[in-house]
Amino acid sequence: MTDTTERGYDRHMLEALVCPVTHATLRYDAEAQELISEAAGLAFPIRGGIPIMLLNEARQIRA
């Protein structure tokens, strides 16, 4: 058993991070390399293994 998700993202890091808008938990999208905040309707990119948790870098996932 390992503490990394598919493509090597650390599960412990994911558990420690929350949405900067709603403080809700995030879902890891391995294919898109994004952290998804369902509560805020935002997707935060992961670049070079580093989550970019800035609102101006987030992508809206719903209208």
UniProtKB/Swiss-Prot annotation:
Similarity-based family: Belongs to the UPF0434 family.
Q: Name the chain's protein.
A: UPF0434 protein Pden_2369
* Listed SUPFAM superfamilies: Trm112p-like
Source domain of life is Bacteria
Give the species this sequence originates from: Paracoccus denitrificans (strain Pd 1222)
GO cellular component terms, alphabetically, are: cytosol
